[in-house]
Amino acid sequence: MAQYTIECVETRTEADNGQYGKFVLEPLERGQGTTLGNALRRVLLSNLEGTAVTAVRITGVNHEFATMKGIREDVLDILLNMKELVLRSYTSDIQIGRLAVQGPKRVTAADLELPTEVQVVHPRHYIATLAEDGQLEMEFQIERGKGYRAIERGSEDGAAIDYLSIDAIFMPVRKVNWTVESERSAANVEQDRLTLEIWTSGSLSPQEALSQAAKILVDQLRPLQEITFEPPAEPQRSAPNTVGQVPIEELQLSVRAYNCLKRAQINTVADLLEYTEEDLLEIKNFGQKSAEEVIEALQDKMGLSLPKDKPARS
């Protein structure tokens, strides 16, 4: 099994609490850098679970185009800010968060009331600004999922009628870059050096994201290690007619020869092969000409010959 090292050569936390990690995998066999880099990037961007707000209910609001007294943002702006909220959930169950604030106030994610299973990644994330007479009360739905889920207009997926659905961005990984460099070993063998750069929203560290992506790939490939290939079952064929089942009518003999054989209880080719030429000549009214006719018919139509000696009967 090929062995390689994985080194985290750089990490940092961004201003919005997003995280960056840079990893180097080496030495890899030639071509494996591209294989691993491409596969890991696709899984990192598409298959990792994340958490997002999927629906919001705002007191006094029944559609997304409304405005609210004493609040700088309209409802669409508030929904957009909630959509960009970065959360980390430790449960797969749907959770409910709440917000109740009175102006004047600059509302951020730190003001949200969240279940114990849910954590805000960036507490300073901006939501709205309230004037002195402003008041904002809302309830929002939190879910785990993968990728990007667009809402279906006219479908509320079972949510209460006064909930406003939001396009959900579950992806915890924002961006992935990978590069492959060729290098030569001490034995002058060409090898790959894979560099992976991972940017996350902060709900996962780059190390966690890489580990989860690798596990998903392994789980997808493991069944291929255990698969057993069985040859396709051959279609059942009906047993071909044996010589014993071919009636003497198939030999198309003359009436004289045919009647003589029938009177001697010779009904099939198998019966006929119990007789030598001398035996046939002993049949009443069966002459040399009839014997030659039978011998020729057996050879031409069946590729068979009469035995030289009488077969031993079991």
Curated annotation (Swiss-Prot):
Signal peptide: none annotated. CDD domains: RNAP_alpha_NTD. One of its GO terms (cellular component) is cytoplasm. GO terms for biological process: DNA-templated transcription. Its EC number is 2.7.7.6. It comes from the Bacteria. Keywords: DNA-directed RNA polymerase, Nucleotidyltransferase, Transcription, Transferase. Residues 1-228 are annotated as: Alpha N-terminal domain (alpha-NTD). It is an enzyme of class 2 (transferase). InterPro entries: DNA-dir_RNA_pol_insert, DNA-dir_RNA_pol_RpoA/D/Rpb3, DNA-dir_RpoA, RBP11-like, RNAP_asu_C, RNApol_insert_sf. Residues 241-314 are annotated as: Alpha C-terminal domain (alpha-CTD). It catalyses: RNA(n) + a ribonucleoside 5'-triphosphate = RNA(n+1) + diphosphate. One of its GO terms (molecular function) is protein dimerization activity. In cyanobacteria the RNAP catalytic core is composed of 2 alpha, 1 beta, 1 beta', 1 gamma and 1 omega subunit. When a sigma factor is associated with the core the holoenzyme is formed, which can initiate transcription. The N-terminal domain is essential for RNAP assembly and basal transcription, whereas the C-terminal domain is involved in interaction with transcriptional regulators and with upstream promoter elements. Belongs to the RNA polymerase alpha chain family. DNA-dependent RNA polymerase catalyzes the transcription of DNA into RNA using the four ribonucleoside triphosphates as substrates. This is DNA-directed RNA polymerase subunit alpha. It comes from Gloeobacter violaceus (strain ATCC 29082 / PCC 7421). The gene is rpoA.
